[in-house]
């Protein structure tokens, strides 16, 4: 923070430099050559140390007033859940991030039991359903060490929740997919 990284890199390289977050870079990578190829509107999420998002609508990556459009980590998915660093209770990041999983289980996320993997997927599906219902998108692409590490139980639970909560004509059939580029998605997008 408070370091002019883009300016310094531009001075040294002579290139145009833009600094952004991993989830927005994931959105670009997945849209170019990953699971979202051909989609004009979608959400890309990283579920890892934190929970972030990048949002593409009508072919454009959204920035937002502070550059954080699509940041789904602070969508409340469990109002009675633990307090989040932002001050709210039950934000997705407070219940689904790697540190949250470790607090819950007392072990690294890689050692989480199947029921925790499914519950985490369910909560991510709930947040994605909010975005799908609000913005009329049909796809969420998810990466990050927690999501990809939890694998099929995570993605199956996420899709089941999405199916339950997206019953409108224009939201029915929305999908949650693992990032086609895996952990390399943000690098490709950068």
Residue spans of the language-model regions?
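ATP-binding/phosphotransfer module of carbohydrate and carboxylate kinases, centering on a glycine-rich
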Residues: 7-15, 29-39, 61, 76-190
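A cytosolic small-molecule/anion-sensing beta-strand core signal
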Residues: 57-58
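Active-site glycine-centered loops adjacent to acidic/histidine catalytic or metal-binding residues
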Residues: 22, 48, 190
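Short glycine-rich anion-binding loops that position phosphate/pyrophosphate groups of nucleotides
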Residues: 48-50, 146-147
